[in-house]
């Protein structure tokens, strides 16, 4: 397996010019994310069927050729389980690969488990056992070892031929349009960014709080998310989620009270005064400015019963279509549908279970069930 390590702008330009001539390329990324909010890009792997390149992002300055390749609609980009890679591209280049085909999604449409691993598919299609010993390596350390480079190169070297076969199988099974729709949905989900003022809704057990406490949590969660993004620090390294909830619940007025709520020394040292000030702001809010209480979906009358009925309808659709129940509907998607039906959460888009390719299979039976609730 021959590869070239790309460390210059001119080298990247040559790789992208060459890749543009191909209808399909395989892409992968290696990144590190331990304490940071954003993934830190350590390596990009690109294989166009002729040339396998390991692109070192640390010395490269001129990314325009790569950004143009990502958005070149004449070149299909294959990724495997690409959700995190999409986040990396979005963060580093403000661009998603278009069009993008995720081979894990193709595998699911050809009868394999929903989260079929890359190594499993490579063993099946290429009859090669991949060495995964470098999976947890530090991709920001330099120089990269030969072992790291071979590991990284294998990810795209086997991905491209395997992807071509999966595309063919998906086509033969009649699911090409649905698989494309699912890949698009993955890109859509990745493009959605959480508005800081709505971050409080994502905090576990936020529904247990009264409006005044919720108003406090809204201020705290917005501040924490903005801090995390500005300082590129994982949210729980700013203030842990359970501690944020405790502050909102008890609305302390002093640093001593923060200590008794169980906040860590560094949390109090760095952010104690800010937290107490935000609590004071929340205490002053007009009643009319407080958020509505958050309904808890699973406490809704009939939740368990309707959930069970929906699951049963999905099993029937799975048997009829030959697609797994996991692919057809996740718990998140069922809850999204019920939140929409009961108007507990307002979104711009129709729920995934009654739109796109899933809607073709599920909308009619699910709407029949929902009429009873």
UniProtKB/Swiss-Prot annotation:
Chief place where the protein resides: cytoplasm
Catalytic activity, EC: 3.1.13.5
GO biological process, one term: tRNA 3'-end processing
A matching Pfam family: HRDC
Superkingdom of the organism of origin: Bacteria
Record-annotated 3'-5' exonuclease domain positions: 3-171
Subcellular localization: Cytoplasm
Transmembrane segments: none
Entry GO CC: cytoplasm
Keyword Manganese attributed: no
Residues in HRDC domain copies: 210-289
Known catalytic reactions: Exonucleolytic cleavage that removes extra residues from the 3'-terminus of tRNA to produce 5'-mononucleotides
Cofactor needs: a divalent metal cation
Keywords: Cytoplasm, Exonuclease, Hydrolase, Nuclease, tRNA processing
Single Gene Ontology MF annotation: 3'-5' exonuclease activity
Class in the EC hierarchy, top level: hydrolase
NCBIfam families with a match to the protein in the record: PRK10829.1 (NF008089), rnd (TIGR01388)
Function recorded in the entry: Exonuclease involved in the 3' processing of various precursor tRNAs. Initiates hydrolysis at the 3'-terminus of an RNA molecule and releases 5'-mononucleotides.
Protein family: Belongs to the RNase D family.
Name of protein: Ribonuclease D
Name of encoding gene: rnd
